Amino acid sequence: MNGVTNDKGHSDVTNTPESGISTPKKKNPKSDKPVKVKNPNNAASKAYTVDLKIQGTNNSSIVSKRSVERLYKEKHDLEFFRHFVKKPQRRSPIINRGYWTRMEAMGYCISAALAEKAPKHVIVNLGCGYDPYPFQHLHKHGLTENLIFVDVDYPDLMQIKVDTIRRSDELTKLVGEEKPAAEIKDKSVLMQTGNYIALSCDLRDLEKFEFIFRNLDLIVEGDNNPLILFTAEVSVTYMFQKDADNLLQWCASLPNSRFALLEQIIPAGTEHPFAKTMLAHFDSLQTTLWSVKKYPSIPAQYERFTCLGWKEVSGISLAQFWDSYVPDEKKEFVENVEAFDEWEEFLLFLNHYSIIYGGADIFQNSKSEYPEHEEFVLQCEKPTSEAHRIGAAACSFQNGVILNGGQAQNRESTSLLLSLDSTDEFIVDKNNMIARQYHSLSEIEPGVVLLAGGRSSPTKKFSDCHILKNGLWKPTFDLPEGRFRHCMQGTLLFGGSESKDQWLHFSPTAGWKALKCDFHYLTPYGATLIMKSPIEGILLGGMDAKGNLGKEVYSVTISEGETVVLSLIPMKSPLIYARYGAQGVYHGNRYLLVGGVSYDILFNEHNQVVELDIKKGNTIPVKLPFESYPLLVSHSVNIVRNCLVVAGGGAVCFSFGVFHSDPEVVGNRELKVIKEQRPSEEVKTEINSTVISVEEGTLESFPAAYVNATPTIFRNCDIGPSSELWKSHDYLKSNIGEDTKVSVHIADNKNLNFQSKNFSYQTLQFGELMKLISDIEADSESSKSAYLRSLSLDNPKSEATDLCKDFPGIARDFKLPKEMADFIGNKVFSTPLRISSSKTQIWLHYDVTANVLCQVTGSKRVRMYHPRDVVHLGFPAGESSSKIPNIFVHESCAQAYEVVMNPGDILFIPPMWLHAVEPQTESISVNCFWKDLDGNKYSKTKDIYGNKDLASYESGREGIKKIADKFAGLPADIKEFYLRRLAEELKQM
């Protein structure tokens, strides 16, 4: 192997267009694959092809490092990768942060060597690729005879690097004046200045390598030996093991030498999901990592260095380097560069890389703590599964676990039921929730599930909450602020991203309430809350804004005064339970901690699940004999029928691929994965003759009714003296004005219908209207109807009616209860006055705005239907009024809801709920409509009634017409075939 090139960090193809550099690969004009060059020595041909593949790992690596350089450049830094990468690309945050840490670790080692006193410092980069470490440090330290950088790699690659330096005035100035070719003693030296040497050499030929070093006066006899630091950043691992070890041993034999080795490790073995994915990635590229299997861990690397002659050795994982050797100010700088929430993937990556330093003790050696308790075993079964979701939320539900959202191939908004009962069905109406992950699900009462928060990206967090009940998701009270990575048990929520109030309690009728806690938990992001009961549990782990892990365990007690009391629990082996993103349950009288990630330990099959014995302060390993090695990050854990169900989970394993964990159930039970099924519209063929009473509520529960979009009747409310004063026609005529002109619906029948227009609009004086109603009421045989729905008196064609403005003489008599008025606030759109004769039915219709109907005098029957039944109740396309003549006698498959309103009763009617009214007596009522969506969501045309459909629906209808027009000219049956297919596709959206 001729030289060594630092690694390829990505699986994407590396070629000339990506790096902008001439590649040393020789190509077949008909193929992108490297040509197996026919050498005179056929035995060398295969090795040469492998060498080409190893050289190819450089291109993508430097594209990633260039991405880091552009984004993470500090104030006085120069951009050196730009000379080698002509077409920069922005990598993902996890790739950027991973490479930043690698570069920072290698820079730390170089700085440590330069800080040692020595007559001269020589920094030798083995497998340098296009790394610009010489330029960076020469820019920092300047040209000096006491500092030399030596870059070593394949001849073709080094020639490109030298040519690039020579073309750049900036780089030429940094490295200094070149020696004339005639003065260079060895042709392997492609470039030499007083501070820089570019060298191509076969590192297996150590005798030749040493000869070159001596010719360059890099090795001298006596006491004036320079300090030589050899660096190898994911490079010598591509050499055959014996050759790599010989190189390390030769370096150790040199006086005053150091070695900084950064390469992969597999501390949890080859079967760990991340390790397995990583090794498969490099094998697929035919760039096998030869060192990692013989030296899989930091202790193994220690032994390697010691056996090869290094008297002092220190080393840590890159996770420990980030945790302990990256200063807080640098961490803060990195945090502010780009949004980031891939901590599980980041720590998995860092735990699979080590930085080993031979020749000096520059790292405080860290030993992972493993408890020496005997582990106990739980039985486990694995289902066949399609439940591959990363960052999904889950909770117990029915006979299993409901799994919502998360990342599969795409981010999901749907749910799955992982059931222990093979006969279960999972019928859930389509929801309009935004796809999300890292939210919470909690069963707040049997069969009722609360979804809270989450995010789509680290910068887009959600505050919306939803309740699943009877197969229907409904919105409920929003969180006080958006949050994700929180934990929730029952109705108790803790922590999450940038949460002002750490502890919240949820009530279905009152919403979220902040709980008091005298102790501010320092690491609330991705912490673990395990509740033994609704008022007792433990809290541990998590992370703060600087990336520090919580290393304490606290008992949690909820007092009667709605105060959270935290008390420190003395525990041993903090490295075992100091975790981010772990899940926990109380099962079999045990606190179980499952999965998560840490800086100090890459959790394996023996310690990724532990029992926390809070009485003795011990952690006890729990063996779960999974059929395959699960990756217990971004997962969920729940108890169902005394069985432990582990669901979801997995990670994007840096650039090496994606690993998904299959669900597991502990307890020898089979688990069935059931996808969401929509309620079938076709089954609604039988007549539904049942009528359900509208739910009653208290004024305190009005906000809950609103956020849950639940029709609710509020009885006997204080609406002012109007319910008494407005009984008198004389009072009304006196205070409105007998000659005030109003527009009235007049009909010779009792069933008014907007579609058939079986009424007329007549302008009457108010006194005439009241006389007409009196006459109708006096004649029990009369079939006439009179109905006033007030309009604006000043601008009836352009303004919505306002009770206070249009009827100031009586408006003072009426008031909304304070609870409602305060909640609605200044969003009121219209307040129409309604006066009608008895039995005057108003047609079935819907309003796009929420409203409350306040009954002032008389009584009124109201019939309502859920918005989803609009397809069954005679609504023409683009119309908000039904064609059904009399909905009160109409036979339908839709479920009806009814209520009879009396004076002082107030009915909340959510947007889009279909409703019709039938006064039982002469009736007066007041509506209050308010707009609760952004203004641009409503129709752009004038809408004084508030019943114009939303702008998106109007736009959608135009789009449908355009789609239908595309099928013009096709036979009718073919057109119908495809339009029906499109209609079905719309239903699934």
From Swiss-Prot:
Location of the region described as Disordered in the Swiss-Prot/TrEMBL record: 1-42
Key word Endoplasmic reticulum present: no
Cross-referenced SUPFAM superfamilies: Clavaminate synthase-like (SSF51197), Galactose oxidase, central domain (SSF50965), S-adenosyl-L-methionine-dependent methyltransferases (SSF53335)
Entry protein name: tRNA wybutosine-synthesizing protein 4
GO molecular-function terms, A-Z: tRNA methyltransferase activity
Residues that coordinate or bind S-adenosyl-L-methionine: 102, 127, 153, 202-203, 233
Xref: PROSITE patterns: JMJC (PS51184)
